[in-house]
From Swiss-Prot:
Site (Transition state stabilizer): residue numbering on this chain: 198
Subcellular location: Cytoplasm; Nucleus; Mitochondrion
Function: Fructose-bisphosphatase hydrolyzing fructose-2,6-bisphosphate as well as fructose-1,6-bisphosphate. Acts as a negative regulator of glycolysis by lowering intracellular levels of fructose-2,6-bisphosphate in a p53/TP53-dependent manner, resulting in the pentose phosphate pathway (PPP) activation and NADPH production. Contributes to the generation of reduced glutathione to cause a decrease in intracellular reactive oxygen species (ROS) content, correlating with its ability to protect cells from oxidative or metabolic stress-induced cell death. May play a role in mitophagy inhibition.
UniProt entry keywords in alphabetical sequence: Apoptosis, Autophagy, Cytoplasm, Hydrolase, Mitochondrion, Nucleus
GO cellular component: cytoplasm; mitochondrial outer membrane; mitochondrion; nucleus
Taxonomic source organism: Xenopus tropicalis (Western clawed frog)
Reaction(s) the record says it catalyses: beta-D-fructose 2,6-bisphosphate + H2O = beta-D-fructose 6-phosphate + phosphate
Protein name (database record): Fructose-2,6-bisphosphatase TIGAR
Primary subcellular site in the record, as a coarse category: cytoplasm
Enzyme Commission identifier(s): 3.1.3.46
Keyword Nucleus recorded: yes
Gene expressing this chain: tigar
Length: 275
């Protein structure tokens, strides 16, 4: 059995986010001035979280956010950011570069509605979920294999970095509203994983956890939080326990969904659907 902390962060704002234009995979837009401020803010919020693995989408808005987070980090040493195409945003095909309002019109003409509508050349929700599933199962295997290797070498969990509650400070000690932050507890994990990805992708990841893995939100977290797209640099944090006997059926504890208190001093709109 192995346990790991999973922190998922959405990239900072881009000009396309601000103007409500679809980016998907074909528009590789860098962060805006506000986006860099958001990335720095989330980096400062996570500065005392110890990460053993860092993964990011290979699109520039995610890369820049991941770099800002790690530049602010004080206790994660010699961690290489791994860029993975499986963490990319949903592909919107012909709708990329167009306003979200046009996507809704396209969906209506096709007798469908967002977000289930797939524009020509775009990815279906099932395809996005398949990417999320593939990457999550990869993470579970990775942590299991590393944990097993350390145990066999008699180093134990401490050989993997000894990630304890003290290394996950903001998620253990930070006092948030009940709707945002679930009850946390003292925990020691074999690994602490940071993922930097995208809004629609993260939304489908959480739907995969809920619908495919039968993950349930704790009472103190409103289930409605599952549905909205995360604000830019919103944070979701989970504790995942995976068994070698049933590696595809991990136990998942949710600590927070779409947390964005670090943006309180930044002039950015977090209320609308940002894609």
């Amino acid at each position: 059995m192995a346990r790991f902390a999973l922190t998922i962060v959405r990239h900072g704002e881009t000009r396309y986010n601000k103007e409500k234009l679809l980016q998907g995979q074909g528009i590789d837009e860098p962060l805006s001035e506000i986006g860099f401020k958001q990335a720095d803010a989330v980096g400062r919020f996570l500065s005392n979280v110890r990460f053993t693995h860092v993964f990011s989408s290979d699109l520039i808005r995610a890369k820049q956010t991941a770099c800002a987070i790690m530049e602010n980090n004080k206790i994660s040493e010699d961690i290489k950011i791994i860029y993975d195409r499986r963490l990319r945003e949903r592909k919107y095909g012909d709708a990329e570069g167009r306003p979200l309002s046009e996507l809704k019109v396209m969906a209506k003409k096709a007798g469908d509605q967002c977000p289930s509508y797939t524009p020509p050349g775009g990815e279906t929700l099932e395809q996005v979920r398949a990417r999320a599933k593939d990457f999550f199962e990869y993470l579970c295997r990775l942590v299991l294999e590393e944990s097993s290797a350390k145990e066999q070498s008699e180093l134990g969990a401490s050989g993997m970095g000894g990630v304890t509650s003290a290394d996950l400070g903001p998620f253990v000690n930070h006092n948030k509203e009940p709707a945002e932050l679930g009850e946390s507890r003292d925990v020691t994990v074999h690994a602490s994983v940071l993922l930097v990805s995208h809004g629609a992708y993260m939304r489908n990841w959480i739907k995969y956890l809920v619908e495919d893995l039968q993950f349930t939100f704790p009472p103190e977290l409103k289930k409605s939080r599952e549905l909205p797209v995360s604000p830019n640099t919103g944070i979701s944090h989970f504790i995942v326990t995976v068994s070698s006997a049933t590696p595809r059926k991990p136990e998942i504890q949710c600590v927070c969904i779409n947390l964005h208190s670090h943006l309180s001093d930044i002039n950015a709109d977090t209320s609308h659907y940002q894609v």
